[in-house]
Amino acid sequence: MCASATRPQPSASNNVKKIILPDLVSHCTFKLRHNRHRKQVTTETKKWLFKDGNLLGQKERAYHGLKCGLLTSMCYPDAGYPQLRVVNDFLTYLFHLDNLSDEMDNRGTTTTADEVLNSLYHPHTWRSSARVGKMTRDFYKRLVLTASPGAQQRFIETFDFFFQSVTQQALDRASGVIPDLESYISLRRDTSGCKPCWAMIEYANNLDIPDEVMDHPIIRSLGEATNDLVTWSNDIFSYSVEQSKGHTHNMIPVVMYQEGLDLQAAVDFVGDMCRQSINRFVEEKARLPSWGPKIDQDVAIYVQGLADWIVGSLHWSFETERYFGKSGRQVKASRIVDLLPRQRLP
């Protein structure tokens, strides 16, 4: 069920100039680590991304401000160089797709999905000159060299879900719909792009975990709790930028609309949900069953990879210029965000 958003959002947000962020960094006690291959991988990914000369001017500046290599390093700290390079290429490319989908109507999203998914499902036979297709085939051919069959399958399936969800997001945007909270959470778990990143944990750490283990309810719950923390905290951190563009695919306006909250109360509401997701992760981790020494060891590495994503994404959000410009560290210390002014429509 979805509610129409053509009615105005709660008026309290129109006059608010600042918000106070929840202190999620202090609530997360996982150890932050870095991968020693970060600088080399960042250099090589930049060459890969820019080799056709298609990212110039503002897009090039946005790439440097993104600091994707730092995110990759924090979230995959134990990966070897070849695997880290593929993961960093993918994450950089994923942010590129995210920017595309944010600006696309439904037709544009579908075209991108066709290019990407055909390149994944048919990497050796699909022929296209589209740059996004060539980039997809390039990193995926490197991934399959060492990824387990299960990791490959989970990567493709979850990336397919990503495109289905961003298509729905584009339709919602075009029709001016704000979904209810339950519908939003379900959709956002796929639009976040997190699920293929969890398959990358398997790949980056050379894991071959049986499908029946990966499908276990506790393993799924751990992935979901991580997805929720990364996604919902991102909704908080990106709110200033998104509201300046009039975007509503964000949990904060959804909560304001459904619960009748003012802006700061909605931020606090989502912050509480983020804390609960970290708590849920810790509780579910303590409930993990045993599948025998070898599988237990691989599962422990996978679960550690999820924890690395929780702590890494939180700290990276204040290092990248994507959300707070060059003021990220100041915002991290004060937790005060000056909201950007609304952009005028052309």
Curated annotation (Swiss-Prot):
Positions of transmembrane segments: none
Catalytic activity: (2E,6E)-farnesyl diphosphate = delta-cadinene + diphosphate; (2E,6E)-farnesyl diphosphate = alpha-muurolene + diphosphate; (2E,6E)-farnesyl diphosphate = gamma-muurolene + diphosphate; (2E,6E)-farnesyl diphosphate = alpha-selinene + diphosphate
Short motif (DDXXD motif): ranges: 98-102
InterPro entries (UniProt xref): Isoprenoid_synthase_dom_sf, Terpene_cyclase-like_2
Needed co-factor(s): Mg(2+)
A biological process from GO: isoprenoid biosynthetic process
Residues the UniProt record annotates as site (Plays a critical role in the stabilization of intermediate cation): F95
Top EC class, one word: lyase
EC number: 4.2.3.-, 4.2.3.125, 4.2.3.126, 4.2.3.198
GO molecular function: metal ion binding; terpene synthase activity
One matching Pfam family: Terpene_syn_C_2
Residues holding Mg(2+) 1: D98
Family: Belongs to the terpene synthase family.
Protein name: Sesquiterpene synthase Agr1
Organism in which the protein naturally occurs: Cyclocybe aegerita
